[in-house]
Each structure stands twice: as C-alpha cells, then as structure tokens.
C-alpha cells in the first residue's frame, strides 16, 4: 500500500491517487508492505529503488545507515505489538532523496498513525524531509516513554502483590509470567532507544541539517538520554521482583516439603510397632495375650501422638 502526502499551507495532506504525476508532488511517500506493482510505480515514476526484506533485517551498522546514489538511508526499529498482542519490533527504512522522504515498512505502526493524526492539525516549521523524519523519531520516543510509564504502573501493582507475602504459589506463578513479559517489553524498548540514538548520531555526522532540524535532533538525543536511566531502573526493578517472586515460590514449596517430611517422620514409630508385630515368628508371646491387639493399637497411637506433640511444641507443624 502506498500513502503519499503533499504540503498545503505547511500541513500534510493525503494524495488520493498514486499516479506518477501525483507522486511527483509528494513530500512524503509512505509504503506499507508494497506489492511488486507499487514498487514498479516508484521505480518508473521517481526512479526510486526500495530496500528488500532481507536488507531491512540486517543488523550491521553499515547496512542500516548509509548514503548512496539513491539517497540517505536509515533503518530504524519501532516498537509495536504482534498479532497475539505481545511486544515486538518492526524495522522501518527511511530514505531521503531530492527533498522527499520515503518510508518503507511491513506493517502499520502506532507511531505512524499518531503522527498522521497530528500532521492534519499542526503546521510544519520548515516543511522539509528532514523535519518529517525527525518528527517521526520524536513521535517514536514519545511512544516509548508511554510504554515505560505503562511498565512502571504494572510493576507498582505487581510489587504490592508480591511483597504482600500472602499469595499462593499458583498466583505467584502467574505474576512471574507477567513479569517475564514486562522484561521482554523493557528489553525491546531499550533496543529501540539505542537504535534511534545510533540513527541520530549518523544523521548528525553525515548530513548538514538546517538549524531548526539540528536543534530538534539534539533535543531528541537529550530525550533519549533522559529515558535511559529511567529504563535501567525499571529493568532492575523487574529483575528484583522476579527474584522476590521466585523466593516466595521456593518458600511455599519448602513449607509443603517440610510438612510432608515431618508427617512421614511422625508416623515412623507407629510403623515400627506395626512392623514388629507383623513378623511371622512362632514364638511371639504377645500374640497369645487376650489384650495383645488393643495393647498394640495403643502403642501405635502413642507412638504417633508423642512425635506430633513434640513437633507441635517445636513449631514444626
């Protein structure tokens, strides 16, 4: 799918048609999982070659940030959710050429939806491709900050549940699963922050940005630097709560094992009495007693009650 946007009074307006003439007027061309026909339209109309899927997934810096005859290229990670609502990251390829911004991605992303909504109302300052690129990065950082706030709120809730110490092992297992998911979210946010920092560093080194965009890029870098310590504290808190949950689960399991161990020891004397009188020897005087059976029962009960009272007194039960 191709979305093309032109400028009208310093605001982005969507172009209804994707003909070569219309695309020539566009300042931003946004492509979501384009077909071969759509790639051909760009190649024939604007002489623009798009990155392939394998190129999008390349992690080498030289393959993610470079400049060639097709323009300036940046490949950046964006946070999103997969089809099962689990944290995921998607790669977006940015290309700036002839004053036009091209964005290529395989799925729709929240940061892009939010920016399109804002762009309908807010005017651009310099109305150039670099401003669009930095606005998208700015929106991404705002989204990541919102994700970190959500993680913080969830951690506060889980910390009360865990440190209360009254939850059963089954409930703590669910909390542990949720904490693992939060750790995954946190790690993906960290990856996006670091990747954006690398992209901006490349942009500042390799291009002569206009003054307003230069200051905007530096502001975004400062925002990233301010989020990183906050992210680190959340990451440490996730690990602390996971260890605390594991500790309480181990305590609960040890309590159960302790109970069964004490019970098994408590019945050992009674089992000994039963074993003695269960032997099949011919000469066992007690077997001839009239009260041998009730006497053996009393001995077994006494042998069971005595350890129980002792363990109870010691606080082991």
UniProtKB/Swiss-Prot annotation:
Domain notes: The central ion permeation pathway is formed by the first transmembrane domain from each of the five subunits. Mg(2+) binding strengthens interactions between subunits and leads to the formation of a symmetrical homopentamer surrounding a closed ion permeation pathway. Low Mg(2+) concentrations trigger both a conformation change within each subunit and a loosening of the interactions between subunits. This results in an open ion conduction pathway. In addition, this results in a less symmetrical shape of the whole complex.
Compartment(s) of residence: Cell inner membrane
Name of the protein described by the UniProt record: Magnesium transport protein CorA
Probable selectivity filter, short sequence motif: residues: 278-280
GO cellular component: plasma membrane
Species of provenance: Haemophilus ducreyi (strain 35000HP / ATCC 700724)
Transmembrane portions of the chain: 259-279, 291-311
Pfam family, one: CorA
Matching SUPFAM superfamilies: CorA soluble domain-like (SSF143865), Magnesium transport protein CorA, transmembrane region (SSF144083)
Gene: corA
Single GO molecular function: magnesium ion transmembrane transporter activity
Top-level lineage group: Bacteria
Key words, A-Z: Cell inner membrane, Cell membrane, Ion transport, Magnesium, Membrane, Transmembrane, Transmembrane helix, Transport
Marked site (Essential for ion permeation) residue numbers: 254
Protein purpose: Mediates influx of magnesium ions. Alternates between open and closed states. Activated by low cytoplasmic Mg(2+) levels. Inactive when cytoplasmic Mg(2+) levels are high.
